[in-house]
Amino acid sequence: MDKTEIINKLVAYKKLLEQHFDVEDVFLFGSYANENPREDSDIDVAIVVKKLNDDYFKDTPLIWKLRKQIDDRIEPVLFEKGKDQSGFLEEIRNKGIVIK
């Protein structure tokens, strides 16, 4: 699967997410963003929401459920804006691809 096809899938996934969350950004990161995927690579996606609907442990199952409507290889990671202390989201912002 090429990068354009992956991005098109993620645009559709973002639209689904926007029906349930106040989405600020969605990023493709990992092997597809770095243009070195293998045949068995998953699709790493960072989802940044302005505010969680409930709490992380209630919202995370929903993003996983929604991905099944698009592609089971999507591996979403949920972030609440301004709450990531690890620096992981900043690295994704710098190296990932914004999904518009």
Residue positions per predicted region:
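Glycine-rich beta-strand-to-loop/alpha-helix junction loops that act as flexible
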Residues: F29-S31
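Short, well-ordered beta-strand segments
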Residues: F27, D44-A46
